[in-house]
């Protein structure tokens, strides 16, 4: 069955016209789905009864099912189950009157970064558009009942967004457009490990979302040790694509940098990173490593973290130290799913 959350409004209009219905019915349907968050056609009372029945027969309105919720302070992590029984994770961070949802785009991940829990079991499959949008609708419904709503969406959960390009871009359009969830493009961030051709392609879209790039090292030798795909898309090519995106969209690019003790957190690494990014339209997010038992790394010492940050700041680079809100609830990417798979005997 066709899930309603996979369609944009023009596609719904075309279907309705094929049924002999006026196209404005699409606006009414989407008002119920995205504004009132009603996922039951029988409750769409301004539609003719016959049309409601036809919609129910043609479309499904399913969203992912909640398996488990863990919470710590202002962070909630949702372990979700999809229709085929696969599991993904979604995180809600509520902070200073903002509600940020972190969504997954794949079941697992094929990149195999040597510090990330998501890639431990590889890639199962891409998420469909409705499975991405469904995560956001799930959280929006929960907040809506409290008189609140989502303010930001970040594509930073499980999987590499640019390796599920079409479904991710369509989901962004659905949540961004006025007929959808109407979340502004400056409040949507896509995070990528650095799939260079797709960064250029994204720059040509009419989206202008914020771009975050997982850099994690100041040179190719170090980066290739923890990010295998760096051998295909080395840092110099990655930076070229990032600066192109910034110029094309007018959006400053964020570089994510996970600090790993005695690997990429030394003074010389900070100086080298500053040399790459100085006088560029960028922001750097420093992230203390969130421990994953399967990897040997340790979190950097605080004194080294602050020294690293100061070197970047002194070079005139905008830099933020990201607080790890979800470390105790295993809210690092893929950690809750990994624990769940272990409990089922699917991960050693």
Swiss-Prot record:
What residues sit in the active site? 89, 333
What does the record's cofactor remark say about binding? Binds 1 [4Fe-4S] cluster. The cluster is coordinated with 3 cysteines and an exchangeable S-adenosyl-L-methionine.
**From which domain of life does this come?**
Bacteria
GO cellular component entries: cytoplasm
**Record-annotated residues binding [4Fe-4S] cluster?**
109, 113, 116
So where does S-adenosyl-L-methionine get bound?
Answer: 159-160, 191, 214-216, 290
Annotated localization: Cytoplasm
Catalysed reaction, written as an equation: adenosine(2503) in 23S rRNA + 2 reduced [2Fe-2S]-[ferredoxin] + 2 S-adenosyl-L-methionine = 2-methyladenosine(2503) in 23S rRNA + 5'-deoxyadenosine + L-methionine + 2 oxidized [2Fe-2S]-[ferredoxin] + S-adenosyl-L-homocysteine; adenosine(37) in tRNA + 2 reduced [2Fe-2S]-[ferredoxin] + 2 S-adenosyl-L-methionine = 2-methyladenosine(37) in tRNA + 5'-deoxyadenosine + L-methionine + 2 oxidized [2Fe-2S]-[ferredoxin] + S-adenosyl-L-homocysteine
Q: What is its main location?
A: cytoplasm
Q: Which residues form the Radical SAM core domain?
A: 95-328
Q: Which cofactor does it need?
A: [4Fe-4S] cluster
Annotated disulfide bonds: 102-333
EC identifiers of the protein:
2.1.1.192
Q: Answer yes or no on keyword 4Fe-4S.
A: yes
Matching InterPro entries: Aldolase_TIM, Elp3/MiaA/NifB-like_rSAM, Methyltransferase_A, RlmN_N, RNA_MTrfase_RlmN, rRNA_lsu_MTrfase_RlmN/Cfr, rSAM
The misc remark on file is:
Reaction proceeds by a ping-pong mechanism involving intermediate methylation of a conserved cysteine residue.
User: PANTHER family recorded for this chain?
Assistant: 23S RRNA METHYLTRANSFERASE, RADICAL SAM CORE DOMAIN-CONTAINING PROTEIN
NCBIfam families membership: rRNA_mod_RlmN
What's this protein's family per the entry? Belongs to the radical SAM superfamily. RlmN family.
What is the purpose of this protein? Answer: Specifically methylates position 2 of adenine 2503 in 23S rRNA and position 2 of adenine 37 in tRNAs.
Q: What is the name of this protein? A: Probable dual-specificity RNA methyltransferase RlmN
The opening ranks of the lineage are: Bacteria, Pseudomonadati, Dictyoglomota, Dictyoglomia, Dictyoglomales
């Amino acid at each position: 069955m066709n899930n309603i959350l996979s369609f944009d409004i023009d596609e719904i209009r075309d279907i309705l016209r094929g049924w002999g219905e006026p196209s404005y019915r699409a606006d009414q349907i989407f008002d119920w789905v995205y504004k009132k968050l009603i996922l039951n056609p029988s409750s769409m009372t301004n539609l003719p009864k016959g049309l409601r029945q036809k919609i129910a027969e043609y479309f499904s309105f399913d969203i992912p099912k909640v398996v488990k919720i863990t919470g710590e302070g202002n962070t909630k992590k949702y372990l979700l189950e999809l229709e085929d029984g696969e599991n993904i994770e979604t995180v809600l961070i509520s902070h200073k009157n903002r509600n940020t949802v972190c969504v997954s785009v794949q079941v697992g991940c094929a990149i195999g970064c040597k510090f990330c829990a998501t890639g431990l079991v590889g890639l199962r499959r891409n998420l469909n558009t409705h499975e991405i949008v469904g995560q956001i609708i799930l959280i929006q419904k929960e907040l809506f009942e409290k008189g609140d709503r989502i303010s930001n969406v970040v594509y930073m959960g499980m999987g590499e967004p640019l390796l599920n390009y079409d479904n991710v871009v369509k989901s962004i359009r659905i949540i961004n457009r006025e007929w959808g969830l109407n979340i502004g493009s400056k409040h949507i961030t896509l995070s990528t490990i650095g799939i260079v051709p797709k960064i250029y392609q994204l720059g040509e879209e009419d989206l202008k979302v914020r771009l975050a790039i997982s850099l994690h090292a100041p040179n190719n030798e170090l980066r290739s040790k923890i990010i295998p795909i760096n051998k295909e898309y080395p840092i110099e090519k990655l930076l070229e694509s990032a600066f192109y995106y910034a110029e094309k969209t007018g959006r400053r690019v964020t570089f994510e940098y996970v600090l790993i003790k005695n690997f990429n957190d030394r003074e010389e690494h900070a100086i080298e990173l500053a040399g790459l990014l100085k006088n560029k339209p960028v922001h750097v997010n420093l992230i203390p490593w969130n421990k994953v038992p399967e990897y040997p790394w340790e979190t950097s010492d605080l004194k080294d973290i602050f020294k690293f940050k100061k070197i970047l700041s002194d070079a005139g680079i905008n830099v933020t130290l990201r607080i790890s809100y979800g470390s105790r609830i295993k809210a690092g990417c893929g950690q809750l799913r990994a624990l769940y798979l272990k409990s089922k005997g699917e991960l050693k």
